[in-house]
């Protein structure tokens, strides 16, 4: 499946070493002002080759809008966007075209489909997430009309945890670090892994401010279930925590409950979601990325003929996918919320009457 969402939905296409990749976004209301500079700025946050903490594959990631926008405004029809690949080096993968790279989707894709694009993983490559960020930028422009603000940052690298979450620090940080006091240590962990031909994992925090009460469709389209679904669809994500997450299973009910006052909730252990519906508090989600599987250390594997062989990788890869992955997680949050905003319009007859009553 290449489509995500119900009312506000997007479909992505393209491969890592193909001619282009892109997306089609459906369900976008007419009349939203499209800021192409903003869309490109979102792409620039995710694009590769910007510093020594990311892959050295250099892509401009310039987005071209093909449809759905007229004179700077959405028309209510499908918005299609395309991003042309510019810096593929398919020759880097010729030595592993018959091998299954440990930690990658090569083995499962080949066994499922009987064929695979070995050039950078093809469709299974994280290169696909560029299209998600483009679609997420459209979702953000919709949410901006409602003053819903989404931000993200890195709260952990290789077990080095942030104790302070400062989203202002993220803006000037090469690794989008939330805590300046541990940023250098986190950077060093990435560089040490890179210099030893290895990789490290990390954790991104996604935060939503000004989310209205009522987003989420129980029972089988709950807000938290769709957030988890969205985040787990991102390459290399192995776990998602909403609010206190795992900690909620380790404390007693009185400690975990968010008591309610006239001014709002006393605490926010639940992460802004109750019963699958947003409660008006800030939404907090932690997204856990595994260490990049593409490493330059010899590993054991098998080939497509079931022979046991050794695997030696070449190419250009992120020493820590969590850094750029945090931007993708932020985009997926925007796409989920845009969908939920539109779905919520039909929750009450009063909402429908406002549109159709004369």
From Swiss-Prot:
Cofactor comment text: Reduced FMN (FMNH(2)).
Pfam short name (any one): Chorismate_synt
Catalytic reaction list: 5-O-(1-carboxyvinyl)-3-phosphoshikimate = chorismate + phosphate
Molecular function, one GO term: FMN binding
Biological processes per GO annotation: amino acid biosynthetic process; aromatic amino acid family biosynthetic process; chorismate biosynthetic process
Presence of keyword Coiled coil: no
Metabolic or biological pathway: Metabolic intermediate biosynthesis; chorismate biosynthesis; chorismate from D-erythrose 4-phosphate and phosphoenolpyruvate: step 7/7
Binding residues for NADP(+): 46
Record Gene3D superfamilies: Chorismate synthase AroC (3.60.150.10)
Cited InterPro entries: Chorismate_synth, Chorismate_synth_AroC_sf, Chorismate_synthase_CS
EC annotation from Swiss-Prot or TrEMBL: 4.2.3.5
The protein's assembly and partners: Homotetramer.
PANTHER family linked: CHORISMATE SYNTHASE
Protein name (Swiss-Prot/TrEMBL): Chorismate synthase
Organism per entry: Aliarcobacter butzleri (strain RM4018) (Arcobacter butzleri)
């Amino acid at each position: 499946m290449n489509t995500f969402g119900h009312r506000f939905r997007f479909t992505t296409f393209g491969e890592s070493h193909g001619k282009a990749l892109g997306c089609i976004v459906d369900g976008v209301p007419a009349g939203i002002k499209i800021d192409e500079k903003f869309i490109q700025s979102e792409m620039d946050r995710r694009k590769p080759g910007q510093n020594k903490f990311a892959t050295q594959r250099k892509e401009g990631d310039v987005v071209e809008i093909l449809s759905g926008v007229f004179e700077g405004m959405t028309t209510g029809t499908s918005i299609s966007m395309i991003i042309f690949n510019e810096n593929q080096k398919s020759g880097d993968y010729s030595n592993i075209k018959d091998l299954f790279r440990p930690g990658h989707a090569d083995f499962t894709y080949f066994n499922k489909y009987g064929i695979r694009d070995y050039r950078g993983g093809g469709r299974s490559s994280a290169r696909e997430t560029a299209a998600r960020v483009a679609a997420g930028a459209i979702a953000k422009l919709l949410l901006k009309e409602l003053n819903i603000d989404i931000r993200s940052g890195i709260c952990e690298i290789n077990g080095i945890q942030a104790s302070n979450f400062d989203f202002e620090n993220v803006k000037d940080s090469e690794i989008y670090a939330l805590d300046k006091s541990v940023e250098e240590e986190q950077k060093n962990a990435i560089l040490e892994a890179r210099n030893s031909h290895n990789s490290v994992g990390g954790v991104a925090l996604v935060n939503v401010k000004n989310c209205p009460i009522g987003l989420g469709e129980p029972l089988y389209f709950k807000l938290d279930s769709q957030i988890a679904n969205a985040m787990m669809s991102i390459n290399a994500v192995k776990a998602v925590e909403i609010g206190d997450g795992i900690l909620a299973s380790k404390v007693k009910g009185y400690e975990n409950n968010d008591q309610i006052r006239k001014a709002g909730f006393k605490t926010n252990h639940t992460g802004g979601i109750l019963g699958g519906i947003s409660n008006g508090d800030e939404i907090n989600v932690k997204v856990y990325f595994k260490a990049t599987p593409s490493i330059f250390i010899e590993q054991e594997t098998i080939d497509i003929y079931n022979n046991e062989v050794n695997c030696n990788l070449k190419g250009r890869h992120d020493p820590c996918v969590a850094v750029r992955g945090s931007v993708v997680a932020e985009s997926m949050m925007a796409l989920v919320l845009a969908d939920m905003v539109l779905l919520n319009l039909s929750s009450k007859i009063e909402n429908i009457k406002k549109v159709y009553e004369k």
